[in-house]
């Protein structure tokens, strides 16, 4: 390699590192009060015990909690941190926030790619909207699967749109070993390439299915069940496939993604902006067709499968919606765009503290912190009595 090429390649990483720091700094600052927050719900009941089984005993299949179909990708990532710095709540939170920072960076890079032909600099808005979102705020520090799945979905999609198909397939392998439902993403890529008769490149995206299949074989050999345990299979497949459950789940997904937490402001802006020919042209691009297919496939999959209708399952789609909203807002006059953006950001931040007037998972906003503190009070009371 010529001597001049090596410094040039190194310099390409400098802007990315600066952007990563730009996004990581506010994310870490706003989470400083919560770095020692005790684990919550699925963290304590599933993912941390699984990670500790791997860390302390080298067991890829959990034995201190009930095993299930979820691949151990996130747990393996946490074990790397535990090997370097030791196990603690704070180290776990920091490890997840690092991944969340990459999620903000990838949202920005993907927004640049998808907003080509749009006036202004709309790519800066989606990371801001994601940072202000209550769901991302809580999930970015929690040892769960959906925020990491969001990160690798964005990475795989970005690489695919850049026509780096082998790298996109590799990112997809990591994605499905992070969360099994991520398989829908390389499946969309496979179909897109088959439609273009790019058979060899489409073949790359068989690798994620093979990786997930290998994990299922390991899980079956260790537990005797393809999904880890019969209760998990019944609740997340058998029960979930009831038509009433599917219909209700789909409505709930649509409501949360497009209306809840003042996202209806973005939806209205998007619908109005689509009346503009230039905006429609952006969304009719091949890149957006693939992106919309990925988002739609994710929404349908998490509506059909999964007994718990948790909003965190929509995390991989949320940045894509924010990118679409940012492009739509760029089509309006500056005052209108600024007012709508300010209202949307303010609404998202308010919903971090304000609980909706209907039942919701506490992990969707800061109610999870209140609940953890309540559990601490109850534990101290139980110890004294």
What are these regions (language model features)?
Residues 29-30, 199-273, 297-301, 305, ...:
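Membrane-lumen/periplasm interface segments of specific transmembrane helices
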């Amino acid at each position: 390699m010529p001597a001049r090429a090596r410094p040039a390649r190194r310099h390409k990483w400098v802007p990315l590192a600066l952007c990563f720091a730009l996004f990581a700094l506010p994310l870490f600052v706003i989470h400083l009060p919560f770095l020692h927050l005790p684990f919550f719900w699925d963290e304590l009941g599933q993912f941390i015990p699984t990670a500790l089984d791997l860390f302390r005993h080298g067991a890829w299949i959990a034995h201190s909690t009930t095993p299930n179909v979820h691949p151990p990708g996130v747990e393996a990532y946490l074990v790397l941190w535990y090997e370097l710095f030791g196990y603690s709540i704070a180290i776990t939170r920091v490890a997840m926030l690092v991944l969340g920072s990459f999620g903000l960076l990838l949202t920005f890079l993907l927004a640049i790619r998808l907003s080509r032909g749009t006036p202004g600099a709309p790519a800066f808005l989606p990371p801001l909207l994601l940072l202000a979102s209550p769901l991302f705020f809580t999930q970015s520090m929690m040892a769960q699967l959906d925020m990491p799945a969001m990160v690798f979905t964005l990475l795989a999609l970005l690489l695919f749109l850049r026509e780096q198909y082998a790298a996109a397939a590799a990112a997809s392998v990591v994605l499905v070993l992070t969360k099994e439902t991520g398989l829908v993403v390389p499946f969309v890529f496979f179909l897109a390439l088959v439609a273009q008769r790019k058979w060899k490149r489409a073949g790359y995206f068989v690798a994620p299915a093979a990786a997930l299949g290998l994990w299922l074989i390991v899980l079956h050999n260790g537990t005797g069940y393809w999904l880890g345990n019969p209760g998990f299979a019944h609740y997340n497949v058998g029960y979930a496939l009831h038509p009433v459950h599917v219909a209700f789940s789909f409505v709930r997904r649509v409501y949360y993604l497009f209306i809840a937490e003042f996202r209806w402001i973005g939806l209205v802006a998007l619908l109005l902006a689509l009346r503009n020919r230039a905006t429609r042209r952006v969304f009719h691009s091949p890149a957006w067709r693939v992106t919309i297919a990925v988002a739609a496939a994710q929404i349908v999959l998490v509506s059909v499968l999964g007994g718990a209708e948790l909003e965190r399952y929509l995390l991989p789609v949320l940045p894509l919606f924010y990118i679409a909203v940012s492009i739509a807002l760029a089509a309006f006059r500056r005052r209108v765009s600024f007012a709508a953006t300010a209202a949307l950001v303010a609404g998202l931040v308010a919903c971090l503290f304000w609980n909706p007037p209907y039942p919701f998972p506490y992990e969707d906003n800061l109610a999870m912190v209140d609940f953890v503190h309540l559990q601490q009070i109850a534990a101290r009371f139980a110890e004294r009595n």
